[in-house]
């Protein structure tokens, strides 16, 4: 059986702040509001990605999001993180923006807004 060292999943699990979304906001605008209110989510996803990519070639941001939800449910007394699945594609792009060297390791697909243009 493999054990996980405690430092491997040490994350900043500050409680989420639910921003106020105005009627008619686009998905991108809602993501930007969520990210502005919760920058620690991107930092935690970045930490998880770095840990994974130190041992593997590819990582799925959906898996990182699920891991973050799980860790927040295990490591805190509050509710597990509730992150809109639609935001994960934006987080993938944000991680690549922060770490261009990860571009070949994180799969992205065109966004609906890109296909509509």
Whereabouts are the PLM-identified features?
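Positively charged, polyanion-binding regions of nucleic-acid-associated proteins
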Residues: 26-75
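Intrinsically disordered, low-complexity N-terminal regions enriched in serine/proline/glycine
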Residues: 20, 30-33, 51, 86, ...
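C-terminal engagement modules used by replication, chromatin/transcription, nuclear envelope/ESCRT
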Residues: 5-10, 89-117
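Generic ordered-secondary-structure signal
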Residues: 1, 36, 40, 55-59, ...
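Homeobox/homeodomain signature
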Residues: 21-24, 54, 81, 85
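Intrinsically disordered, low-complexity serine/threonine- and proline-rich regulatory segments
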Residues: 2-42
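Charge-enriched amphipathic alpha-helical scaffolds
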Residues: 62-104
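General "foldedness" signal
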Residues: 45-48, 59, 78, 82, ...
């Amino acid at each position: 059986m493999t054990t996980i060292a405690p430092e491997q999943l040490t994350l900043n699990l500050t409680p989420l702040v639910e921003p106020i979304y105005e009627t008619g906001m686009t998905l991108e605008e809602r993501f930007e509001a969520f990210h502005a209110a919760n920058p620690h989510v991107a930092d935690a996803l970045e930490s998880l990605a770095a840990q994974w990519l130190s041992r593997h070639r590819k990582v799925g941001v959906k898996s990182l999001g699920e891991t973050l939800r799980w860790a927040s449910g295990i490591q805190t007394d509050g509710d597990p993180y509730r992150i809109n699945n639609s935001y994960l594609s934006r987080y993938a792009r944000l991680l690549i923006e922060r770490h261009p060297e990860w571009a070949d390791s994180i799969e992205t697909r065109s966004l609906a807004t890109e296909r509509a243009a």
